[in-house]
Amino acid sequence: MSSNDPSALPYRDTKPQGSADFYFATNATFRFLIGRFGLAGWRRYLEELGRGYFAPVNQQWRRGGLGAVARYWRDFFAAEPGGVVTVEELPDRVEVVVHACPAIKHLRAGGREVVKEYCQHCFFLGVARAEAAGLTMRLAGGNGSCRHTYGRPSAELPVQDMQSIVEARL
């Protein structure tokens, strides 16, 4: 990415990729929040994070539509160490197919016990962000490979089946 092609990410970094050790901190934080506040409290935290912290990106998505969503996810995963991801922009939706999740991959390589609800965080964050941008979001899979779908309301995505989000495990 050249300096003439700014990233769709809301932050700037001098290194080409983030630090994979962040995944250890995220996993530990989720474990703490779930233990302290329960699943409902953790979900509220993620929803507020999706609406609040990600507000600048959500606004980009609202203004730029599905093209902005696709660009964001391409830039996001380009900065994540170890992920294998395909982003496809279709007329009514964007499909983010995670063939190898960088977080789960790193947690496993580090021998960490992965919070079993870990993969649900992508759903709760994603729904909050999509709704703020006038879109819908669904998630299927997990535990290292999944599919995120961001769609226009006209895409009429089926109701989310929470059973389709696989629990994370070592």
Stretches found by the model and what they are:
Residues 1-120, 128-149, 153-170:
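N-terminal accessory segment detector
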